[in-house]
Structures are given as structure tokens and as C-alpha cells.
Swiss-Prot record:
Family stated for the protein in its record: Belongs to the class-II fumarase/aspartase family. Fumarase subfamily.
InterPro entries: Fum_hydII, Fumarase/histidase_N, Fumarase_C_C, Fumarate_lyase_CS, Fumarate_lyase_fam, Fumarate_lyase_N, L-Aspartase-like
Alphabetical UniProt keywords: Cytoplasm, Lyase, Tricarboxylic acid cycle
SUPFAM superfamilies registered for this protein in UniProt: L-aspartase-like
Protein's recorded name: Fumarate hydratase class II 2
Site feature Important for catalytic activity, where: 325
Pathway as given in its UniProt record: Carbohydrate metabolism; tricarboxylic acid cycle; (S)-malate from fumarate: step 1/1
Natural source organism: Pseudomonas aeruginosa (strain ATCC 15692 / DSM 22644 / CIP 104116 / JCM 14847 / LMG 12228 / 1C / PRS 101 / PAO1)
First-listed, main subcellular location of the protein, grouped into a coarse class: cytoplasm
E.C. designation(s): 4.2.1.2
Job description of the protein: Involved in the TCA cycle. Catalyzes the stereospecific interconversion of fumarate to L-malate.
């Protein structure tokens, strides 16, 4: 038995692995693009198969395919989704800019299996690709995959992170710590106020990400090659969206303008921008956690993160803040992905963007990373850290910035003199204020009470 078989396409004959479900066009792409060894994302291929199933059903309803053939195509797509389908999709991310290679990969695999199911010939171009062009199915698949991943993975992960932060805020409400601006001592804050700020950042990032879903749910499908809809039934776009909604439970619809959706990737650029904002938020949270956990002896030591693994191959007993570090690296990667997507978004020449696979890969990579690390940050860092009350109290007692509360009574200049003396002499602020003002200790204890100062006001 030979290891290959001969397949044919419009360019001629080509040897293909004997057991491969794909055909000549996929094999040409494999031969042409041995670039990264990185295949198109699983979420993208999943969405592409859903789109092919929706297209087949739409074409049956519009009498563009006979029912047995259309059903064979749709059923094949859905069956593939229940299996290890990625083994049949070997095309590299760095391929033709339209993603035609990935489209034909899907068409050929589905045609092979649908032919077996039907007991007759199913053609990759004429049947599986009926009413479609790579130029509308690939932009549509980018939107479909991103919308699904955001809805099913990222937004639930962000809700979990926010809820975990809120729960921890309630747990640590009684603790008051030294606030810091410019990494320098400032007025006191409650730990719950710090975490409340984090929760709001995460919540707002989620709102902004969710706000791009209506745009992602507008599809280029039906515009075919250049946006005019050539070779697609006039009602194909509408029927396609209806069938896709039945399969996904989302609210996809034909785009307001096919020319814009095929010629540009503005929606993906906008979505990536919101993902970058979330990355910036998570970087801030990670850095706050690392600083508060620093030490344990020579740093701030305000909290103790859960010890998850040894931190050094040479220094025994060292434990590092590995989850915040992983979070910070994810944030850096997402910011880099956003830059790549922005460059790719500029690469729309006339009627087609020609960096579609790059957009898909980076956008879905960012969503995946952010969803996964948000859950890790919640479960393995925020939920389990412990507060070091001794460190908090020690720092508060020696914080001359508490004198700020005396500004309305003794004035800024006098307060500054007291703060500087307390710094210089290493004495508690209340003792220095007692010597340099007419206020008695009882009054100063009320005015300089860190807990009361966290409530603001005069």
C-alpha cells in the first residue's frame, strides 16, 4: 500500500497522504507554507465548520442544494465538531492573506466525508462552498469565532474574577493599609477599597468587551468575492444568519455593508483594543499583588500569596508570585497581539484585507489567554492570599502623611513641618503633632485615626 494518493485541482495533479481527508488545494498550502508549524486556532476551525453547516442548510432552504446533499454536508460538519477535527486542518497560520487555504481545507475535508455519508460525489467548490467565497466566509468566521469565544469563555471568566475580588473585599474589609502614590507613602485606605477598585476595573473592561459583540455579530456572509454578492442567492445572507443562530444561540445578522466588512477588519481591531484594555487592567492587578506580597522581610510584606511551587533552583525556601507573573506576561502578549492586529487592519487594499489569518490567530489567542489567566488569577492568587496585619499596623503607625488630616486645622505649612520632623526623627506622627500644636492627645487620636481617615471628608 502506497503512502500517497493522487488528487487533482485546477492546477493539475498532486500527491496527497493516502489517509488524509483533504485534497490537492490543502496539500499545496501545506507545501507552500512551512512557516511556523502553527495551525489556525481550534476556535476558528470550529466556527468555520459551523458556518459551513449553516451555509448548507441555507442553500437547501433556498433550493440551491438538494436536501440529501445539503443535509450530508451539514451533518458532516456537526459530526466533525464532536471528534478530534484539528488533525484534518494542517494549514499554517502564515498562508495566503485571504485565508483561502483554510477555506479550501474545510471544503475538501467536508466534501470527502459528506461523499461517504451521501454515497455520491460532493464537490468542495460547487457544493460545500456553494454561495460563498473565501473573501466573505473567512471574515465572517473571524467574527463568529471571536463572538463565540467572548460569550462562552471570556465574559464568564471575567464575571468569576470580579465576583472573587468582591468576595475577598468583604473578607478583608477590616484591614487598613498605607495607601501609596508614586510608590510613596500616602493616606490610608481599606483593603476592601483597594479590591473594590480592582473589581470595578474588571467589570468595566467586561462591559467594554461586551459592547463589541453587536458589531462582531454583523457578518460579511453573502457579499462573496468583493461585496456585490455575485453567485449567492439574494436571500442567502439572511438565511445563513438564521441557520447560524439556531446552531450557536447568538444573534448574528447580515452586515450593514458587505464592502466594509470584506475590505476592512475594523471590528476586529476595535475588539482587540478592548482586549488590550483588559490586559492593562490585569497588569495593574498583577503588579499591585506583587508589590504587596514583596519580601517577606525586606519588602512590603502586606499580604502573603499562596505558595504554589519552589521559586528558585539555588535559593532554598524561596517562593515567588508566579500567578501574578504569568498574568503580567499574558498582558504583555495581548498588547503585542493588538499591535499585530492593528498593522494587519491597515492591510486592506481596495476590496479585501489580506492579513485575515493573522487577525484571526492573534484575536483568538488574546481571548484565550485572557479567559484562562483571569480564572487563574481569581482562584490561585486573589481568593487565597492572606493579610499580614502586623505589617499593616506597623507601617500605619509610622506614616507621617497622616498629618494631612490636620491641614484644615493647622494649615499645610505647619503640617509639612510636622511630617518632616517625624520622618527625620523616626517618631510617630501623633507624638510630634502633640509637641507642635495646641491639640491634645485625645483630639489627635480622633483626627489621626487611620480607619476614620479611609472614609474621607473633613
Amino acid at each position: 500500500m502506497t503512502d500517497t494518493r493522487i488528487e487533482r485541482d485546477s492546477m493539475g495533479e498532486l500527491a496527497v497522504p493516502a489517509t488524509a481527508l483533504y485534497g490537492a488545494q490543502t496539500q499545496r498550502a501545506v507545501n507552500n507554507f512551512p512557516v511556523s508549524g502553527q495551525r489556525m486556532p481550534q476556535a476558528f476551525v470550529r466556527a468555520l465548520l459551523l458556518a459551513k453547516a449553516a451555509a448548507a442548510r441555507a442553500n437547501v432552504s433556498l433550493q440551491q442544494l438538494d436536501a440529501p446533499m445539503g443535509e450530508a454536508i451539514a451533518d458532516t460538519c456537526l459530526q466533525l465538531l464532536q471528534e478530534d477535527f484539528m488533525q484534518h486542518f494542517p494549514v499554517d497560520v502564515f498562508q495566503t492573506g485571504s485565508g483561502t487555504s483554510s477555506n479550501m481545507n474545510a471544503n475538501e475535508v467536508v466534501a470527502t466525508l459528506a461523499s461517504r455519508r451521501l454515497g455520491g460525489k460532493v464537490n468542495p467548490n460547487d457544493h460545500v462552498n456553494c454561495g460563498q467565497s473565501s473573501n466573505d466566509i473567512i471574515p465572517s468566521t473571524i467574527h463568529i469565532s471571536a463572538a463565540l469565544e467572548i460569550s462562552e469563555r471570556l465574559l464568564p471568566a471575567l464575571r468569576h474574577l470580579e465576583q472573587t475580588i468582591q468576595s475577598k473585599a468583604g473578607e478583608v474589609h477590616a484591614y487598613v493599609k498605607t495607601g501609596r502614590t508614586h510608590l510613596m507613602d500616602a493616606m490610608p485606605v481599606r483593603m476592601s477599597q483597594v479590591l473594590g477598585g480592582w473589581a470595578q476595573q474588571v467589570r468595566q473592561a467586561g462591559v467594554h468587551i461586551e459592547s463589541v459583540l453587536p458589531a462582531l455579530q454583523q457578518l460579511a456572509q453573502g457579499g462573496t468575492a468583493v461585496g456585490t454578492g455575485i453567485n449567492a442567492h439574494p436571500r442567502f445572507a439572511e438565511r445563513f444568519s438564521q441557520e447560524l443562530n439556531d446552531l450557536t444561540g447568538l444573534a448574528f445578522r447580515p452586515g450593514d455593508d458587505f464592502f466594509a466588512l470584506i475590505g476592512s477588519q475594523d471590528t476586529a481591531v476595535a475588539a482587540s483594543g478592548q482586549l488590550k484594555t483588559l490586559a492593562v487592567t490585569l497588569m495593574k492587578l498583577a503588579n499591585d499583588l506583587r508589590w504587596m506580597n514583596s519580601g517577606p522581610l525586606a519588602g512590603l510584606g502586606e499580604i502573603e500569596l499562596e505558595a504554589l511551587q519552589p521559586g528558585s533552583s539555588i535559593m532554598p525556601g524561596k517562593v515567588n508570585p508566579v500567578i501574578p507573573e504569568a498574568t503580567a506576561m499574558v498582558a504583555a502578549q495581548v498588547i503585542g497581539n493588538d499591535a499585530a492586529i492593528a498593522v494587519a487592519g491597515q492591510s486592506g487594499n481596495f476590496e479585501l484585507n489580506v492579513m485575515l489569518p493573522l487577525v484571526a490567530d492573534n484575536l483568538l489567542h488574546s481571548i484565550q489567554l485572557l479567559a484562562n489567566v483571569s480564572r487563574l488569577l481569581a482562584d490561585k492568587a486573589i481568593a487565597s492570599f492572606k493579610v499580614n496585619q502586623g505589617k499593616l499596623s506597623e507601617a500605619l503607625a509610622r506614616n507621617p502623611i497622616l498629618v494631612t488630616a490636620l491641614n484644615p486645622i493647622i494649615g499645610y505649612q505647619k503640617a509639612a513641618e510636622i511630617a518632616k520632623q517625624a520622618y527625620r526623627e523616626g517618631r510617630p506622627i501623633i507624638d510630634v503633632a502633640l509637641e507642635n500644636t495646641d491639640l491634645d492627645r485625645a483630639r489627635l487620636e480622633v483626627l489621626l485615626d487611620p480607619e476614620k481617615l479611609t472614609a474621607g471628608g473633613l
